[in-house]
């Protein structure tokens, strides 16, 4: 309890400083560096504020609507009780701070804002850019950052950073990369790794640690490679890691590579984010390759309640993947759709990598013919467990991987139909209680199958359609069905939601013995205070508690009639939703009075609303509504009832 209170106190301190000290105002349009820095007489340049020593409780204000070009080097630290705050004043658009297109001479800077060996600070309501086009003598050509926080001294710990309501966009190095420029995949990989470009970077030299970071309610777009990059330069054998990172309620749109990349972190929580088109290639400079999230040499990484749409790229580019040598990675309650690489990717050297209660729709459509470098038959996967780590020819199989209670659907047809590979090279892998569904000419596991785990435990999975027979036969207690999913014959809903007679209800194996839930190490950090050690609900918040006969798949609903609930008054207003999985319209039962309705996305934004008359039992989805996770709210004059739904408007396209 004391640990939880301490973390909550830090969050509270982000909202206000207990003892505000100096206030500095800057305006690039009306300021002058000879002014006194007050709101009435603001300074003008980043150089002026860079040469000002800041202390605990200080606040730096940038004028909204202004653009500040150059290099802001933060000089000074706050304390845990009195943070330094960087924010805005006035009206209009967020102030822009850019390290490029300035008149300082000497070329574009490596980053717009640099924090070196300073800590205890808040960045709130700023827009950060850094599109480098002019070389600088002390900066590599393939490097660019928006904000860089760094420890460059051994055994120095930096604490308490908050980034909220921020925008990171238009961050590029001098040059780009295109797969067509290479004829060797290894040379391409080296070139890819050489790009150090991100909107927000945390870097620790050997022996240094950055601790207690929150990035929330922020927007990332038009970035050449990475949204947020956390790095620690400690040796592989070292136990030094950056600690306690939280990324929540952020939106990432058209990022050239990965959205969130934790490298050598311990305790990282990534939740309630929208990842839309990672691995984008909207211009020649963009990298064009990336899973939304992947981790490397990290401990205790929880990735939950996110949505990933349309990840692309020549390699990786799954929705969320587990890279090399991690311990306790939990990927749960996420929705992934149209991700080019596939669904599950667990590379070598991991312990307890877990995919559970996720929904995957049309993931794994990559074709090797789309890339001149790629000539391997398993380039796209439904499940991929690799036993290799980068830089080693030895086998490093991952131990105790769990893949359970996921719903996996591939239903593209015609020229868009595709099949996937399944490769399992691990130790003590468990695959149970999953739905694998393929139809319309698409398939799962027929492209290639490699199964190299003598201790593979696979049971109580449901198979429908064109699924590899080899994969099916590995299941000791499989459920084979023809379609028993709701509304397939009608065609106005997605065909992969269970209905009353579905054979997936109560058909799963119990969570006991070899199939017991792996525990999340929630006591390892305060950031996990609201994370459950063991799951008690399914993807749609249906209860799992005490269930000795769970369903197969991501939904544990026991009937077709799924009630919208008021959690504090669960017996009122018995309105039912026919289907959690929606493509064109929401079908309801029991609408015996009028309601206002709203569809709210995972960032809390109302994306569609209207009026539902009594006895009208359908809501037509707006064409502009994108795929993802929503909460449906029905409200009358006294009460509000809700249900979680998934909207699947597949935007499958193999072309950028």
Per-region residue spans from a language model:
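Acidic glycine-/aspartate-rich tracts in secreted/extracellular proteins
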Residues: 29-34, 65-67, 78, 90-93, ...
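C-terminal outer-membrane/trafficking sorting elements
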Residues: 569-656
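Bacterial Sec-dependent N-terminal signal peptides
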Residues: 1-22, 654-655
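Beta-solenoid repeat scaffold
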Residues: 23, 52-98, 114-127, 153-167
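Surface beta-loop-beta hairpin patches that serve as ligand-binding interfaces in beta-rich domains
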Residues: 505-564
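Glycine- and acidic/polar-rich repeat regions and solenoidal domains
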Residues: 71, 103-115, 129-158, 169-212, ...
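Acidic Gly/Asp/Thr-rich repetitive segments characteristic of extracellular carbohydrate-active
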Residues: 28-63, 67, 502, 540, ...
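Beta-strand signatures of extracellular beta-sandwich domains
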Residues: 25, 61, 596-600
């Amino acid at each position: 309890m004391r640990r939880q209170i301490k973390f909550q106190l830090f969050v509270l301190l982000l909202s206000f400083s207990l003892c505000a000290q100096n206030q500095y105002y800057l305006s690039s349009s009306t300021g002058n560096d000879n002014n006194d820095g007050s709101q009435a007489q603001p300074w003008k340049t980043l150089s002026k504020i860079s040469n000002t020593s800041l202390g605990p409780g200080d606040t730096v204000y940038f004028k909204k609507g202004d653009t500040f070009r150059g290099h802001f080097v933060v000089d000074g630290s706050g304390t845990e009780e009195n943070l330094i705050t960087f924010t805005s004043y006035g009206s209009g658009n967020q102030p822009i701070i850019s390290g490029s297109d300035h008149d300082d001479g000497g070329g574009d800077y490596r980053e717009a804002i640099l924090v070196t060996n300073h800590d205890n600070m808040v960045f709130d309501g700023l827009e950060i850019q850094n599109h480098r086009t002019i070389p600088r003598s002390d900066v590599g050509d393939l490097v660019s950052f928006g904000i860089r926080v760094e420890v460059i001294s051994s055994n120095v710990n930096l604490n308490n950073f908050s980034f909220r309501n921020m925008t990171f966009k238009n961050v590029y190095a001098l040059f780009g990369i295109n797969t067509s420029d290479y004829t060797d995949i290894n040379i391409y990989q080296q070139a890819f790794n050489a790009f150090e470009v991100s909107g927000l970077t945390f870097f620790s030299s050997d022996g240094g640690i950055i601790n207690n970071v929150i990035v929330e309610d922020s927007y990332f777009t038009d970035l050449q490679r990475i949204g947020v990059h956390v790095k620690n330069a400690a040796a592989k054998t070292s136990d030094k890691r950056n600690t306690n990172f939280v990324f929540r309620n952020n939106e990432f749109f058209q990022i050239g590579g990965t959205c969130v990349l934790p490298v050598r972190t311990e305790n990282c929580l990534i939740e309630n984010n929208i990842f839309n088109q990672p691995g984008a290639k909207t211009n020649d400079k963009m990298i064009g390759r990336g899973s939304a999230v992947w981790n490397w040499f990290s401990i205790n990484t929880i990735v939950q309640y996110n949505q990933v749409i349309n990840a692309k790229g020549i390699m990786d580019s799954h929705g969320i993947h587990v890279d090399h040598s991690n311990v306790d990675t939990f990927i749960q309650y996420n929705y992934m759709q149209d991700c080019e690489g596939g669904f599950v990717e667990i590379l070598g050297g991991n312990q307890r990598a877990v995919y559970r209660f996720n929904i995957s729709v049309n993931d794994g459509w990559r074709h090797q013919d789309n890339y001149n470098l790629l000539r391997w038959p398993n380039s796209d996967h439904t499940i991929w467990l690799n036993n290799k780590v980068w830089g080693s020819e030895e086998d490093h199989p991952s131990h105790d991987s769990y893949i359970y209670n996921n719903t996996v659907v591939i239903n593209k047809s015609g020229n868009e139909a595709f099949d996937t590979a399944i490769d399992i090279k691990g130790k003590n892998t468990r695959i149970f209680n999953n739905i694998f569904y393929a139809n319309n000419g698409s398939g799962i596991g027929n492209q290639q199958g490699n199964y190299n785990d003598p201790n593979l435990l696979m049971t109580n999975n449901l198979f429908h359609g064109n699924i590899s027979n080899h994969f099916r036969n590995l299941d000791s207690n499989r459920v084979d069905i023809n379609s028993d999913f709701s509304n397939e014959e009608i065609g106005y809903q997605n065909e992969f939601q269970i209905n009353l007679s579905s054979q997936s209800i109560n058909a799963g194996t119990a969570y006991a013995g070899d199939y017991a839930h792996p525990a999340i190490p929630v006591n390892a950090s305060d950031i996990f205070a609201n994370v459950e050690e063991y799951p008690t609900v399914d993807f749609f918040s249906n209860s799992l508690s005490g269930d000795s006969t769970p369903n197969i798949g991501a939904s544990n609903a026991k009937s077709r009639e799924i009630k919208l609930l008021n959690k504090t008054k669960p017996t009122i207003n018995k309105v039912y939703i026919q289907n959690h999985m929606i493509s064109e319209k929401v079908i309801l039962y029991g609408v015996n009075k009028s309601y206002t309705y709203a569809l709210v996305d995972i960032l809390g934004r109302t994306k569609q609303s209207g009026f539902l008359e009594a006895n009208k039992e359908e809501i037509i989805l707006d064409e502009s509504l994108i795929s993802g996770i929503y909460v449906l709210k029905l409200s009358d004059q006294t009460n509000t009832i809700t249900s979680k739904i998934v909207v699947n408007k597949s935007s499958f396209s193999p072309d950028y």
